[in-house]
Amino acid sequence: MNIFSGIEYKVLKDVNLDRKYDGIEYDSRKIKENYIFVAFEGANVDGHNYIDSAVKNGATCIIVSKKVEMKHNVSYILIDDIRHKLGYIASNFYEWPQRKLKIIGVTGTNGKTSSTYMIEKLMGDIPITRIGTIEYKIGDKVFEAVNTTPESLDLIKIFDKTLKKKIEYVIMEVSSHSLEIGRVEVLDFDYALFTNLTQDHLDYHLTMENYFQAKRKLFLKLKDINNSVINVDDEYGKRLYDEFIVDNPEIISYGIENGDLEGDYSDDGYIDVKYKNQIEKVKFSLLGDFNLYNTLGAIGIALKIGISMEEILKRVSNIKAAPGRFEALDCGQDYKVIVDYAHTPDALVNVIVAARNIKNGSRIITIFGCGGDRDRTKRPIMAKVAEDLSDVVILTSDNPRTESPEQIFDDVKKGFIKSDDYFFEPDREKAIKLAINMAEKNDIILITGKGHETYHIIGTKKWHFDDKEIARREIVRRKMVENVN
């Protein structure tokens, strides 16, 4: 098959271009003998600067998105808008593995990761590939995630490996960014779940309308829009549902307040699940409406796949939180420490409200920060949320990246109404220690922002930093001091 089939390209230099190639990469460090190197301009790195390195490593064909000096004895191909075309080249090279798979796409501001984990759980023994923020999993093999939705070339490689392992289903998080820049352009989805849409990524999308339109693209990529599952308690979900339901009557709507599929907390440790006028009481160990919403969405997808409600509800009882999602750390202390990925205003509301509902809880001590080089408009909103809903607030650092930490903190502080009624500790490790040392019996410490992440980004460098690791260490240290005294 011609790997350039279906796309416009211009041959700048032909050196045995029709040869059979052994691989394709956009990272020059991964290039081997007789590989194709794809050079494109990323947000921080321009691949055209690494052509020499790629050729040195064995590249025999260079795909460029702008004219360059052709000083090597290799083929050069010019392709405009290569980020959108890379998926076609990769698909041609790997013979379109995605067409032989059933792909479940999950999109929304919050809940994508938890939903993919829950869908996997509800599918029981069906082997799956799962792609998302925390990790990429192919059968029983787990790989570190680079992006929520990988580059199109990496996606196609994952699909190729999935097929070779005889796995049929792929569950993947689909970010708005990936929908906008073409990472999923060559995919047609079999099922799609919409969790919610709240403020985030406005540094990229600029407006909520643009953000919504990006998410909406997933549903236009469905083979059959009837295989949608949509949260209609969310205003944008309701809008999506209202648009599509007229011509697609089999869409499943869900929610706590409205929907074909409804759920609510009932007795302690149980939820009621209502579907087609049947109500079932199910044991449920997770706290917070956000976990209930994610579970309902996962149930909807499982139903669409063809799993019986009876089988689904048996598995609901065994659902556990994804790593770093409202994850409790138990080191024998008499106060609670919970780590959560919440880094948007809505997610912060959800975790604090969930903490409030914990039985015998006392004060809520919330640690939060805001990432650098990201949506600045959400920063004061998060401060207001933390102040309004918490008893104690500790403002700290959370991946400042290349932005001035002082600028980030200044933006955040504008949201505090009581100007001095919070703790400010820019050193995140010290902030965690401060919270643990001030905690009293039955207090609940919420360490938000990083969740599963094990790094802190300062400038362009990642430093090892694990909220859970530090919190456990400080809990144990405090207990040792108390035992001595």
UniProtKB/Swiss-Prot annotation:
Q: Where in the cell is it found?
A: Cytoplasm
Q: What is its main location?
A: cytoplasm
The cellular component terms of Gene Ontology attached to this UniProt record, alphabetical and capped at eight, are: cytoplasm
The molecular function terms of the Gene Ontology recorded here are: ATP binding; magnesium ion binding; UDP-N-acetylmuramoylalanyl-D-glutamate-2,6-diaminopimelate ligase activity
Catalytic activity, EC: 6.3.2.13
| Pathway connected to this protein | Cell wall biogenesis; peptidoglycan biosynthesis
- What is this protein's name? UDP-N-acetylmuramoyl-L-alanyl-D-glutamate--2,6-diaminopimelate ligase
Q: Which catalytic reaction applies to this protein?
A: UDP-N-acetyl-alpha-D-muramoyl-L-alanyl-D-glutamate + meso-2,6-diaminopimelate + ATP = UDP-N-acetyl-alpha-D-muramoyl-L-alanyl-gamma-D-glutamyl-meso-2,6-diaminopimelate + ADP + phosphate + H(+)
Give the coiled coil ranges.
none
Which residues are UDP-N-acetyl-alpha-D-muramoyl-L-alanyl-D-glutamate-binding?
S28, N147, T148, T149, S175, R183
Q: Give the Pfam families listed for this entry.
A: Mur_ligase, Mur_ligase_C, Mur_ligase_M
Annotated keywords: ATP-binding, Cell cycle, Cell division, Cell shape, Cell wall biogenesis/degradation, Cytoplasm, Ligase, Magnesium, Nucleotide-binding, Peptidoglycan synthesis
Tell me which domain of life the UniProt entry assigns to the organism this sequence originates from: Bacteria
Q: Which cofactor does it need?
A: Mg(2+)
Q: Is Ion transport one of the keywords?
A: no
The record's Gene Ontology biological-process terms are: cell division; cell wall organization; peptidoglycan biosynthetic process; regulation of cell shape
* Enzyme class, broadest EC rank: ligase
For binding meso-2,6-diaminopimelate, which residues are annotated in this chain's numbering? Answer: R374, D398, N399, P400, R401, G449, E453
Q: What organism does this protein naturally occur in?
A: Fusobacterium nucleatum subsp. nucleatum (strain ATCC 25586 / DSM 15643 / BCRC 10681 / CIP 101130 / JCM 8532 / KCTC 2640 / LMG 13131 / VPI 4355)
As for what it does, the entry says: Catalyzes the addition of meso-diaminopimelic acid to the nucleotide precursor UDP-N-acetylmuramoyl-L-alanyl-D-glutamate (UMAG) in the biosynthesis of bacterial cell-wall peptidoglycan.
PTM section of the record? Carboxylation is probably crucial for Mg(2+) binding and, consequently, for the gamma-phosphate positioning of ATP.
Amino-acid positions noted as binding ATP in the UniProt annotation, renumbered to this chain: G108, T109, N110, G111, K112, T113, S114
Q: Which InterPro entries match?
A: Mur-like_cat_sf, Mur_ligase_C, Mur_ligase_C_dom_sf, Mur_ligase_cen, Mur_ligase_N, MurE/MurF_N, UDP-N-AcMur-Glu-dNH2Pim_ligase
Positions occupied by motif Meso-diaminopimelate recognition motif:
398-401
Q: Which family does it belong to?
A: Belongs to the MurCDEF family. MurE subfamily.
> What gene, per UniProt, encodes this protein?
murE
At what positions is N6-carboxylysine found?
K215
